[in-house]
Curated annotation (Swiss-Prot):
Pfam families: Ribosomal_L35p (PF01632). Disulfide bonds: none annotated. Residues 1-26 are annotated as: Disordered. PROSITE patterns: RIBOSOMAL_L35 (PS00936). It comes from Idiomarina loihiensis (strain ATCC BAA-735 / DSM 15497 / L2-TR). This is Large ribosomal subunit protein bL35. InterPro entries: Ribosomal_bL35 (IPR001706), Ribosomal_bL35-like (IPR021137), Ribosomal_bL35_CS (IPR018265), Ribosomal_bL35_sf (IPR037229).
Length: 65
């Protein structure tokens, strides 16, 4: 049986943690930044964890993660 393919878009966006979760970059930090406060932009720089309801979908996209 051939190898399963990883979703390349997902492999660039998600990293698996030691406990089995996935971390990812937060959105809303690419453009239209002038109306956002410095505090909001600073907090958006932090990594966030994928919600537990979505972990199963990410696991399917990354079979070897």
């Amino acid at each position: 049986m051939p190898k399963m393919k990883s979703n390349k878009g997902a492999s660039k966006r998600f990293k698996k943690t030691a406990s089995g979760g996935f971390k990812c970059k937060q959105s809303h930090l690419r453009h239209i930044l002038t109306k956002k406060s410095p505090k909001r932009k600073r907090q958006l720089r932090a990594k966030s964890m994928v919600h537990e309801a979505d972990v199963k979908l990410v696991v399917r996209m990354l079979p070897y993660a």
